[in-house]
UniProtKB/Swiss-Prot annotation:
This is Acetyl-coenzyme A thioesterase. SMART domains: START (SM00234). Homodimer or homotetramer. Keywords: Cytoplasm, Fatty acid metabolism, Hydrolase, Lipid metabolism, Repeat, Serine esterase. The keyword Secreted does not apply. Its main location: cytoplasm. GO terms for cellular component: cytosol; intercellular bridge; nucleoplasm. One of its GO terms (biological process) is acetyl-CoA metabolic process. CoA binds at residues 54-56, 83-85, 145, 235-237. It is an enzyme of class 3 (hydrolase).
Length: 556
């Protein structure tokens, strides 16, 4: 573990005692949130030099668990200061004191606002950047802030869009459970020990109480042991003080295979407001849980069947938030991508080609695809796994399957319909059905353009099925080294599956298991602030349907 404390960084170490743990002997998520909020607040005040209050804590990801007897270290530092607010990066490491083994336990980002005395104006000093990683985080902080600021508009737009195809989403997979029995309400009286050093209710304490009622709500659905996996955002809308009554209301909103979203609302009442029944909405959060059974196996949650209008609003809201959450993953943190491309070896071309095709088929057959968008001829799905996000786009095309196959298997034609592709050329004709292409793509997020070296393996249907396959994956070819003009990027697994509907139409399914280098092209669409996937899909349909006999001569 790093022992040195960097300038501007605050470090807290805690030995986990029984009082900090839940019934399973694991560190309570609520207790951890209290410690994280305290550490982040002190980091903010160290930079600002004046009192600071929590505005929000978001993108909280729990990577592991900690148990009684282990030691945790919380590191918090300001990544960027804006005019009156700061983003604080929080990282929690757990260490076993017997083995010395360390693991990443949790990461999160908090936003704190400086609170001057009286009417004094505040303009926070910039963060002094000393390392390349600090510069990266400083730049990403600006991107994360943009996502936060546009969150409400993005959410409202997705909700508006989803209302047009709500029946399609609900009917995609019939729900079997209702959320009626998951409603939880609890009350807390704010006492002096619950207040922070400013006299307001300690934000970490409010988050801990919220986590408690959310856990109870999740347990009522799963009948197992729920554990907190992530939190979209704790958003503090207003303060509360000693003497306030805080009412916490929690209910399950929706389920996604092995996860469940629970929404929590907090209202504060002073003595007069309590008598009048007029509270103040001071906080909201959406907590995502996994759960295990008595054999410690992950539970698959039942699909939710919304019944009332409010059920449906919450059901759709959870889908929208999940979509935004997936889309903003690439701006949460910066990690160096591990090379995944296969080394091209002509003596193993058969094996590499077959592996390419099988990987695409396996991706398509995975369970857990969640629909995010439905249009007249287009459906978009996402699949969130432990370390990967994949996208699937189904298109109904008014053209024979063999025509679509010939057009899509010739990647030199892709720049004609895909706005991300600048150029695409064959650099190695391996066989009749396997080619290696060099591809250049457009600039994204103001960076340098990206280039790819990919193996394309195409297969016509076998006798026992009617599926045409076009599979892509990156390979390393010594004759095409990386260039300083481009960022050499990778395709893990992508391609098209084409099935005939009748003699004059087909279904084209595009799949892509996204690498870090490809995710920026898709993130805005998945997250709801771009329509690039829909636009590319519509362009692809138009390209195939409008293909002329002359345009097909080279591929037929």
């Amino acid at each position: 573990m790093e022992s040195m404390v960097a300038p501007g960084e605050v470090l807290m170490s805690q030995a986990i005692q029984p009082a900090h743990a839940d019934s399973r002997g694991e560190l309570s998520a609520g207790q951890l949130l209290k410690w994280m909020d305290t550490t982040a607040c002190l980091a903010a005040e160290k930079h600002a030099g004046i009192s600071c209050v929590t505005a929000s804590m978001d993108d909280i990801l729990f990577e592991d668990t900690a148990r009684i007897g282990q030691i945790i270290t919380i590191r918090a530092k300001v990544t960027r200061a804006f005019s009156t607010s700061m983003e604080i990066s929080i990282k929690v490491i757990v260490q076993d004191k017997f083995t010395g083994i360390q693991k990443l336990l949790c990461v999160a980002f908090s936003t704190f606002v400086a609170k001057p005395v009286g009417k004094e104006k505040v303009h926070l000093k910039p963060v002094l950047l000393q390392t390349e990683q600090e510069q990266v985080e400083h730049n990403l902080a600006s991107e994360r802030r943009k996502v936060r600021l546009q969150h409400e508009n993005t959410f409202n737009n997705i909700m508006k869009e989803s209302s047009r195809f709500s029946d399609s989403i609900c009917n995609e997979e019939e729900g079997t459970a209702t959320t009626m029995g998951t409603s939880v309400q609890s009350i807390e009286l704010v006492l002096p020990p619950h207040a922070n050093h400013h006299g307001n209710t300690f934000g970490g304490q409010i988050m801990a109480w919220m986590e408690t009622v959310a856990t109870i709500s999740a347990s009522r659905l799963c009948h197992g042991h729920p554990f907190l996996k992530s939190v979209d955002m704790f958003k503090f809308r207003g303060p509360s003080t000693v003497g306030d009554r805080l009412v916490f209301s929690a209910i399950v909103n929706n389920t996604f295979q092995n996860s469940v979203e629970v929404g929590v609302r907090v209202e504060a009442f002073d003595c007069q407001e309590w008598a009048e029944g007029q509270g103040r909405h001071i906080n909201s959060a959406f907590l995502i849980y996994n759960a295990v059974d008595d054999q410690e196996k992950l539970i698959t949650f039942p699909r939710i069947q919304p019944i009332s209008k409010d059920d449906f609003r919450r059901y759709q809201g959870a889908i929208a938030r999940r979509r935004i959450r997936l889309g903003r993953k690439y701006v949460i943190s910066h990690k160096k991508e591990v090379p995944l491309s296969a080394q091209w070896d002509i003596s193993k071309k058969g094996s590499l080609s077959n592996t390419n095709v099988e990987a695409l088929k396996n991706l398509a057959s995975k369970s857990g695809w969640e629909i995010t968008t439905t249009l007249e001829k287009i459906k978009i799905y996402t699949l969130e796994e432990q370390d990967a996000i994949s996208v699937k786009v189904e298109k109904l095309v008014g053209s024979p399957a063999h025509i679509a196959y010939h057009l899509l298997s010739d990647l030199t034609k892709r720049p004609l319909w895909d706005p991300h592709y600048i150029s695409c050329e064959v650099i190695d004709q391996v066989s009749e059905d396997d080619q290696i292409y060099y591809i250049t793509c457009s600039v994204v997020n103001g960076d340098k353009p990206k280039d790819f070296v990919v193996l394309v393996s195409r297969r016509k249907p076998l006798k026992d099925n009617n599926t045409y396959t076009v599979a892509l994956r990156s390979v390393v070819l010594p004759s095409v080294p990386s260039s300083p003009q481009y960022i050499r990027s990778e395709v893990i697994c992508a391609g098209f599956l084409i099935q005939a509907v009748d003699s004059n139409s087909c279904t084209v399914t595009y799949l892509n298991q996204m690498s870090d280098s490809i995710l920026p092209y898709f993130a805005g669409n998945i997250g709801g602030w771009s329509k690039s996937i829909e636009e590319a899909a519509a362009s692809c349909i138009k390209f195939i349907e409008n293909a002329t006999p002359d345009g097909l001569k080279s591929v037929l």
